[in-house]
A protein has these predicted regions:
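Hydrophobic alpha-helical bundle signature of multipass membrane enzymes
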Residues: 4-167
Length: 167
């Protein structure tokens, strides 16, 4: 059982994904999205307003406990970590032509916006917070886990591609 104390609340409140900020590769993606991509004229400032729950909130604590209780299915997670492959498989399953160039363009154009938002909020990954709450998570780290956790890039890009493909 975890007990909130003044000391651990102060420690938990300070946890961020990174103290280092964005590297050059990520900065180039942000610049591409702002200046060249499909969304170059898209003003996403309104998405910079809504903060995620505080690290010390019961919402975060309950979410971490929920994640801890989920069965680990590494094969499923790895299979669905590749957004392009997921949509390609859905198209194959439904005998539809997979629009590879369009999907590639959507992913490339949205990546910088997502990265910019992620580093604006600098939200720690769940495993970074879990240790402060004495919660044990698996040690498997995916390639997609090398940015702050909020907002979810997989969710944004999955919804974006799904909405475009349904039209």
């Amino acid at each position: 059982m975890f007990v909130f104390t003044v000391e651990n609340i102060k420690d938990i409140a300070k946890v961020v994904y990174s103290q280092d900020g964005m590297d050059t590769k990520r900065l180039k993606k942000v610049e591409y999205s702002k200046n060249e991509g499909l969304f170059k004229d898209f003003n996403y400032d309104k998405y910079k307003i809504t903060n995620p729950p505080k690290n010390t909130s019961m919402t975060v604590y309950n979410e971490l406990q929920y994640l801890q209780d989920l069965p680990e299915d590494l094969e499923y997670v790895k299979e669905h970590d590749d957004i392009k492959k997921v949509f390609e498989n859905v198209c194959i399953e439904h005998n539809l032509k997979y629009p590879k160039e369009l999907v590639d363009s959507l992913l490339k154009s949205s990546a910088g916006i997502i990265i910019d938002l992620k580093f604006k909020f600098n939200r720690p990954r769940p495993f970074q917070l879990a240790s402060h709450y004495n919660i044990d998570f698996g040690n498997e780290k995916l390639e997609s886990m090398h940015t702050p956790s909020y907002p979810s890039g997989h969710s944004i890009q999955g919804i974006l591609i799904g909405k475009v493909l349904q039209t």
